[in-house]
Amino acid sequence: MRIVEVVDARGHENVQSTHRATFEVTRETRLTRRGDCVVAVGAMKGAADLNLRFKEAARKDNARITITIEADEVKEVVRAKGNSRLSFTHPMDLVVRRSGYVCGRTVAVGADKAASHFSRKLVEKMRDPCQKIKITLTVES
């Protein structure tokens, strides 16, 4: 089974994309320079808003989750895993982790990339407040 979830967001001048363990997309519209894992703001969805079918499929320990982040022609693909402990309860944030840590904000674990691994070309685009960013989450179980 393959389920796709699309989240639209935008860039922000304070995007750092330097965190080594996670990356985050948030519904918040403000961002300080301390938010070094945040790669997009103004998202249309938080973890709690994701489709029920997506959540159920991602809660399987053998689920494969692919996250594609696109800004115009520049894109990054991240491969991660599902986990039976995912709760998808946070109303504001979507967090992808390299580790196995799970909380209400977590949408995938065991990722092969974090914010610091994104191309600097993409990061430059993510620093533009007018830049539309498309995040596509695909779960296969």
Over which residues does each language-model region extend?
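Short, solvent-exposed interaction modules
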Residues: 49, 74-123
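A low-complexity, Ser/Thr/Gly/Pro-enriched, surface-exposed linker/loop concept
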Residues: 11-32, 66, 70-97
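Short, well-structured hydrophobic secondary-structure segments
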Residues: 38-79
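Short, structured patches in soluble enzyme cores that scaffold and shape functional sites
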Residues: 43, 71, 98, 111, ...
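Solvent-exposed alpha-helices and their adjacent loops that cap or buttress functional pockets
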Residues: 29-33, 58-59, 99-101, 127
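N-terminal intrinsically disordered, low-complexity segments enriched in P/E/S/T
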Residues: 2-6, 12-14, 22, 128-134, ...
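Short, recurring structural edge motifs at helix starts
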Residues: 34-41, 54, 103-109, 123
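A generic structural signal for short beta-strands and their flanking turns/coil linkers
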Residues: 35-37, 61-67, 90-92, 105, ...
